Structure formats: C-alpha cells, structure tokens
C-alpha cells in the first residue's frame, strides 16, 4: 500500500496540491492516520518556503512544523548523505553501554550528551552506511535483552562488557 501512496503522490508538488481527504483516504490502509496530514502539511511548507526543495541540514529541516531532531538527522543523512549522527533507541543503547558502561537509569547519560558523543563518531565518508550499521548493530547484537556480547566486535573497549542480563 505504501508503494501505491508513492505512485499517487510521486513528488512534493502533487502531495501539496492534492485534496487532504483524498490523501487521507489513500493512506488509510497504512494506519497511523495523522501521518498523511503531517506529510501534506510539510509538503506545502516546503513548496512555499523552499521552492519545493527539501532542506539539507538538520537545522533547516527542524524549522518545518512536525520535524524533530531524529527525523531531521535521518533526512539529512539518508537523503543527502550528510555526516550527521542518528540516535534512535538502539544507537543510544550501544553508545550508553560502550562509552558509559551501563544502560541503567542511574548511570545513563542525558539525550544531548549521547547526541554530542554520536556527532564525534560519525565519519565524513559513508555516513549513511555508518548510521545504518550502528542501528542494525544495536538491533541485532547489542540488544536490550540478551545482548550477544561474546560475538561483539566492541568487546575490547566496551565499558559494559560483558553485560549481565
């Protein structure tokens, strides 16, 4: 159904100009029905404020209503290959364990501290691949429950190794 949505609205201009009820009806099978309204609102804002070109930097993207820090970073990195960090739940866990030693609430660093650390780690070359790999690593190896510490390539420097669960 997502591909049908993209086929019907292949660009920002088409989405921005479509009747909202039509956009909502096309999206309905995908669930989370506030999303098409927000997407259309952003498409209209990009058309009006940026001449139809999606901004490249997280700072400019966050000026769009409804775009937060993570989404702005994701668009900047995955859409424009900009070397910006992405910190989702999985990445947060990897960085908390690897660089701060734990993932408990007593020792967990605040969100800004983790984002600042993540920013120092993103390579200038291939930030897309790096961010994807780090998210995948947190989802498959450094998992919330039963992390695979024995197979972890970060063992030699991970401050939480081995994680006891």
Regions found by a protein language model. Give the residues of each.
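Catalytic cores of DNA base-excision repair glycosylases
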Residues: 1-164
